[in-house]
Amino acid sequence: MSNVPAELKYVESHEWVRAEGNDEYTVGITEHAQELLGDMVFVDLPEVGDQINLGDDCAVVESVKAASDIYAPLSGKIIAVNDALNDAPELVNSEPYHEGWLFRIKASDKSELSSLLNAEGYQALLDEEE
């Protein structure tokens, strides 16, 4: 069973969102998602300064099994990307909720937060998929 940290919010497409304060949010993929994808070999991240909209495909994670689009969980501006993934994409596998984060976004529409799942809701989604 996958680890689903209670302090995070989730999207049905298996991204997680962590509030950092000041309308800034860190985004990554869940432990469940990286387990399905397998060993990461490449991560294509958005550019700092990019404007993205809720639901946009804004990044790609590529594993030995498949390439998978990452969808924006919130609208806003990309303010940071995890450059460590250029040399070590496997961090997405080993540390999906910490060192394996993908990007940070400055949210432009806080009302979108209400569409995110809490840990209990995301766990229920995982239970349905099994």
UniProtKB/Swiss-Prot annotation:
HAMAP family: GcvH. The keyword DNA-binding does not apply. The glycine cleavage system is composed of four proteins: P, T, L and H. Residues 24-106 form the Lipoyl-binding domain. InterPro entries: 2-oxoA_DH_lipoyl-BS, Biotin_lipoyl, GCV_H, GCV_H/Fam206, GCV_H_sub, Single_hybrid_motif. The modification N6-lipoyllysine is found at residue 65. GO terms for biological process: glycine decarboxylation via glycine cleavage system. Its cofactor is (R)-lipoate. Keywords: Lipoyl. Belongs to the GcvH family. NCBIfam families: gcvH, PRK01202.1. CDD domains: GCS_H. Binds 1 lipoyl cofactor covalently. This is Glycine cleavage system H protein. The keyword Transit peptide does not apply. It comes from the Bacteria. GO terms for cellular component: cytosol; glycine cleavage complex. SUPFAM superfamilies: Single hybrid motif. The glycine cleavage system catalyzes the degradation of glycine. The H protein shuttles the methylamine group of glycine from the P protein to the T protein.
